[in-house]
Each structure stands twice: as C-alpha cells, then as structure tokens.
C-alpha cells in the first residue's frame, strides 16, 4: 500500500520537473518581479484615470513614480533577462512550459487586484 501511495505521489509531482530550465528561470524571475509589476499596473491605471479627469499635476507625479520603478537597476536587469528568455520559450518543444507560465501570470494578475 505504501508503495502505491509513493508511486501516485511521484507521478503527480512529475509535471513540475517537466519544465525546461528556461521556463523555470522565467517563472522564478517573474515571481521576483511580481510586486514591481503589480505596482506598475496600478500606476498605469491611475495615470489613465488622471489623464481622463485632466489632473495634470497627478499625471506628472504618477509618471515620475513609474519612471523611478523603471530606473531601478535590479528590476531593469531582471526584465532584460525575461526579454532574452521569451523567444526561447515561444519555440520551446516542452508543451508544459507555456501553460505553466500562463497559469503563473493569471495567478499573479488576480493577486494584484
């Protein structure tokens, strides 16, 4: 009975190991960038609202905050690495890569809300 339980547990955990190294790295970096991406998403919405409502002073300050996030060297380095990995992942032969990354993005989107 223990052997069957062990076999089932190991079979269920196989998809996590099925991801390519590039996908694992992409997902790791994306998870590290999640708070910054969430803040950028909120700032984009606030900027759009301020522009519609013609609150020019707010637009200026929000854009400055957004630019400050982009100037962070650590963030810029991680975003550059994601840009390098993305073409490799689009051509990946592993069918699990893109679905796992998409699942992570959807979960991050709803956590940010």
Segments predicted by a language model, with ranges:
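N-terminal signal peptide c-region/cleavage motif recognized by signal peptidases
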Residues: 13-15
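Sec-dependent signal peptide recognition
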Residues: 2-7
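Compact alpha-helical subdomains of small soluble proteins
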Residues: 63-113
């Amino acid at each position: 009975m223990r052997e069957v339980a062990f076999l089932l547990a190991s079979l269920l955990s196989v998809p996590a190991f099925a991801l390519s190294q590039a996908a694992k790295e992409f997902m790791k970096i994306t998870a590290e960038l999640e708070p910054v991406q969430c803040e950028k998403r909120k700032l984009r919405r606030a900027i759009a609202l301020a522009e519609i409502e013609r609150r020019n002073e707010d637009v200026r300050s929000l854009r400055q905050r957004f630019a400050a996030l982009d100037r962070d060297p650590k963030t810029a380095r991680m975003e550059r690495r994601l840009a390098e990995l993305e073409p490799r992942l689009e051509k990946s032969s592993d069918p699990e890569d893109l679905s796992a990354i998409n699942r992570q993005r959807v979960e991050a989107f709803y956590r940010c809300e």
